[in-house]
């Protein structure tokens, strides 16, 4: 285990970004690395402000009925324990399925909102967050805001805002955050502060003078825009609507499986943050732009008391990940903030622990970061460990920031589903096109929950199964007295020969685990399902049988990319209800629809 804790390595950012001695460069994929972190980069705020309200605040109550297409539940099957030493669960659980308490279609084919309709990019890159009264969804480069039944609204799933480009949150901010509408934007609800966090990466290098504002010089405050000037977010403008395509034609789809063209060696990238000033996502936002030296792909934000942690990949052709954290305390009050990053070579996609609930880690506790073992670019498709790091951030003295690890946690052997990402994997009925599985990575979210006298971390990824399908490998780790994760239980959910993959997990206030995932195969079009377990159940089993959220009605034939990720969110109103979003195809559709659903596991109810 290597520890970086050397003051002489720190260089404060005086230009667009600061790279430390021995800092981050793109790594030759043929050169194995030891997964240790580089020294810390410190990024100053390029610009920040407080926006005008995003849209008109609406408290209107709707009595219009909601139509949910909820599908039948699988029949009850007798329970058997897995054989000793075998973590693959080949039969369903013996408990009734989780109760579906809400279900409606989100962004995608068939969606219409106050700003009309839109075309949606592939993959969907689904992101979902849930607050006291609202649900916010982002699909690749579009966003929408929905009602949530409760004190303010009498119905769930009514669109209040959208579909709009995600960059609409940055209208009036200037620079690349306003000008460029890239995909992979992600939303989180910070339950500890009742705020909404939107993170949007900028994928193209910033080279023109209009975009490249540069970071502040030493001693110079971050640039601020005037609050509420014309052109800042107000009522959203209707998106341009192209004319309808001729009959029997399909819209052009960019082949996202082809490698991106090489970027010029000049210019930097940017990461854009918007943090709401209150619990209403239609209100104003504190907005920030940071520049980064490395390509900021696939961000996976996580809420932790001392920061918002946002790891990113640096591209599909390199084995190098950027692990960053931004100063949450400063951002919550709209103050000038910094971002600290390290580079970790030779590792798969990283995920940082994301807090579920309001029971926080002990003061000063480091954030836990994890990745699957193996490396697809080295053709290492299997392993028997999960890698873990401890990220200690020091905002007063960044020289003391360090990332300890990796710790290699032994787990049951696994093989990446279909050998990793961008592979022809999941078959579909009557179609030659197979779908991608993203089998090389732990999926968002990496869940942290403090319940009772212990602290748990839940992780999921997609693995091959004995029957030749795909299964959801899941883990619960617990932190020991040294704050190191130790395996508590694990399992692979594969009750038949179908494919279950692209999972996302959550843990409710009772310590119950719920997992949503895509389901499909040669006999079934891809849809969305949900399974789980109670904290008191036998270890290593998902005892709560599958609930069906959405059943696919057609095959996706225009691209192999499927979702890239799904997402869960725990409802802050009761700390029990688990929300989930994923894709499915309607009959005759040429692109995806998304289904948003809410589940409640047995025995968890009531306000927190």
Tell what function each PLM region has.
Residues 2-10:
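Bacterial N-terminal signal peptides that target proteins for export
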Residues 11-19:
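Bacterial N-terminal signal peptides
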Residues 15, 235-236:
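N-terminal leader/targeting segments
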Residues 25-232, 240-246, 251-608:
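C-terminal PAP-associated
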């Amino acid at each position: 285990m290597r520890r970086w804790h050397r003051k002489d390595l720190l260089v404060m950012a005086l230009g667009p970004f600061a790279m430390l001695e021995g800092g981050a460069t793109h790594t030759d994929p043929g050169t194995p690395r030891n997964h240790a972190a580089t020294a810390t980069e410190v990024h100053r705020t390029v610009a920040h402000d407080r926006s005008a309200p995003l849209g008109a605040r609406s408290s209107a109550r709707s009595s219009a009925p909601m139509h949910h297409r909820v599908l039948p539940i699988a029949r009850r099957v007798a329970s058997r324990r897995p054989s000793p030493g075998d973590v693959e669960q080949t039969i369903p659980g013996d408990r009734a399925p989780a109760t579906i308490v809400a279900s409606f279609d989100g962004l995608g084919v068939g969606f219409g909102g106050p700003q009309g309709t839109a075309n949606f990019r592939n993959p969907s890159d689904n992101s979902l967050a849930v607050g006291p009264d609202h649900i916010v969804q982002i699909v690749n480069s579009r966003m929408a805001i929905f009602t949530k039944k409760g004190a303010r609204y009498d119905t769930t799933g009514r669109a209040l805002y959208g579909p709009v480009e995600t960059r609409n949150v940055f209208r009036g901010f200037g620079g690349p955050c306003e000008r460029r509408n890239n995909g992979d934007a992600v939303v989180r609800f910070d339950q500890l502060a009742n705020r909404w966090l939107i993170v949007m990466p900028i994928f193209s290098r910033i080279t023109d003078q209009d975009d490249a504002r540069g970071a502040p010089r030493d001693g110079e405050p971050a640039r601020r825009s005037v609050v509420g000037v014309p052109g800042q977010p107000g009522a959203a403008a209707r998106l341009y609507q192209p004319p309808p395509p001729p009959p029997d034609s399909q819209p052009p789809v960019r082949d996202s499986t082809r490698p991106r063209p090489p970027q010029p060696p000049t210019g930097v990238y940017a990461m854009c943050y918007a943090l709401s000033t209150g619990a209403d996502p239609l209100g104003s936002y504190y907005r920030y732009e940071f520049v980064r030296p490395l390509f900021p792909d696939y961000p996976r934000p996580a809420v932790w008391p001392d920061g918002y942690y946002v790891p990113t990949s640096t591209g599909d052709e390199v084995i190098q990940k950027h692990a960053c954290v931004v100063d949450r305390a400063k951002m919550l009050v709209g103050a000038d903030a910094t971002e600290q990053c390290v580079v970790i070579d030779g590792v798969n996609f990283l995920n940082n622990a994301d807090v579920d609930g309001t029971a926080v880690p002990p003061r000063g506790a480091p954030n836990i970061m994890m990745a699957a073992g193996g490396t697809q670019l080295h053709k290492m498709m299997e392993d028997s460990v999960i890698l873990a790091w401890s990220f200690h951030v020091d905002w007063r003295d960044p020289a003391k920031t360090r990332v300890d690890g990796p710790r290699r946690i032994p787990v049951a052997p696994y093989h990446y589903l279909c050998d990793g990402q961008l592979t022809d994997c999941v078959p579909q009925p009557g179609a030659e096109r197979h779908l991608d599985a993203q089998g090389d990575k732990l999926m968002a979210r990496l869940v942290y929950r403090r319940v009772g006298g212990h602290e748990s971390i839940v992780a999921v990824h997609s693995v091959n199964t004995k029957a030749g399908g795909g299964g959801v490998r899941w883990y619960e780790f617990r932190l020991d007295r040294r704050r190191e994760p130790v395996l508590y239980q694990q399992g692979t959910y594969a009750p038949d020969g179908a494919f279950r993959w692209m999972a996302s997990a959550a843990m409710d206030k009772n310590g119950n685990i719920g997992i949503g995932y895509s389901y499909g195969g040669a006999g079934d079009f891809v849809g969305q399902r949900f399974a789980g377990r109670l904290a008191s159940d036998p270890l290593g089993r998902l005892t709560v049988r599958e609930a069906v959220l959405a059943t696919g009605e057609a095959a996706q034939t225009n691209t192999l990319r499927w979702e890239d990720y799904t997402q869960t969110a725990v409802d802050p109103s009761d700390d029990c209800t688990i929300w989930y979003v994923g894709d499915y195809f309607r009959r005759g559709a040429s692109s995806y629809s998304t289904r948003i659903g809410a589940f409640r596991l047995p025995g968890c109810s009531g306000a927190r």
